[in-house]
């Protein structure tokens, strides 16, 4: 099956630049320690790289 990514917001977006806030919101994260699951594709990987210091990522098989 396709790989999926479990993305968890581990640091706050308070005081972060607007583009990083928008990226976190686009990933579907609203609250601290919230986890969302996305398909593993280049677009999602690019967003993760942009806010890598705010999130943790786990690869999961489904």
From Swiss-Prot:
Gene3D superfamilies linked: Ribosomal protein L30, ferredoxin-like fold domain
InterPro entries noted in UniProt: Ribo_uL30_ferredoxin-like_sf, Ribosomal_uL30_bac-type, Ribosomal_uL30_CS, Ribosomal_uL30_ferredoxin-like
UniProt entry keywords in alphabetical sequence: Ribonucleoprotein, Ribosomal protein
Superkingdom: Bacteria
Biological processes annotated in GO: translation
One annotated Gene Ontology cellular component of this protein: cytosolic large ribosomal subunit
Family: Belongs to the universal ribosomal protein uL30 family.
Protein name: Large ribosomal subunit protein uL30
Gene: rpmD
């Amino acid at each position: 099956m396709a790989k999926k990514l479990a993305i968890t917001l581990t640091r706050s977006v308070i005081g972060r630049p607007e583009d990083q806030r928008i990226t976190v919101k686009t990933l579907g994260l609203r609250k601290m320690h919230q986890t969302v699951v996305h398909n593993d594709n280049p677009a999602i990987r690019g967003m993760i790289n942009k806010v890598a210091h705010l999130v943790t990522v786990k690869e999961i098989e489904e």
